[in-house]
């Protein structure tokens, strides 16, 4: 697994200040999701990792929904930077 392929949208100075921000949490979950998907491509029967991936996907989806309700502009910018598909809303 190559760690250099992961997204580095947030600079080091910003990560020290904003570790609790919604954007940083979504960014962190996105990196974890990318690592787990690359792991699951090699280990297809690793069901515990699949369960962990589904949990992280749910957490990220809830945070994205929260961010879209609170601030649409920041939500759109983050989705573009992280190359995430927009969630379907009812």
From Swiss-Prot:
Pfam families in the cross-refs: Ribosomal_S15 (PF00312)
Keyword Cell membrane attributed: no
Cellular localization per UniProt: Plastid, Chloroplast
InterPro entries: Ribosomal_uS15, Ribosomal_uS15_bac-type, uS15_NS1_RNA-bd_sf
Keywords: Chloroplast, Plastid, Ribonucleoprotein, Ribosomal protein
Subunit text: Part of the 30S ribosomal subunit.
Name the record gives this protein: Small ribosomal subunit protein uS15c
């Amino acid at each position: 697994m190559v760690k250099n392929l992961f997204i580095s949208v947030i600079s080091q100075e910003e990560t020290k200040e904003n570790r609790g921000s919604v954007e940083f949490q979504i960014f962190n979950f996105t990196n974890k999701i990318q690592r787990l998907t690359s792991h699951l491509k090699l280990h297809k029967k690793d069901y515990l990792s699949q369960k962990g991936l589904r949990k992280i996907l749910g957490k990220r989806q809830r945070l994205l929904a929260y961010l879209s309700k609170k601030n649409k502009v920041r939500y759109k910018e983050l989705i573009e930077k992280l190359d995430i598909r927009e969630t379907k809303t009812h």
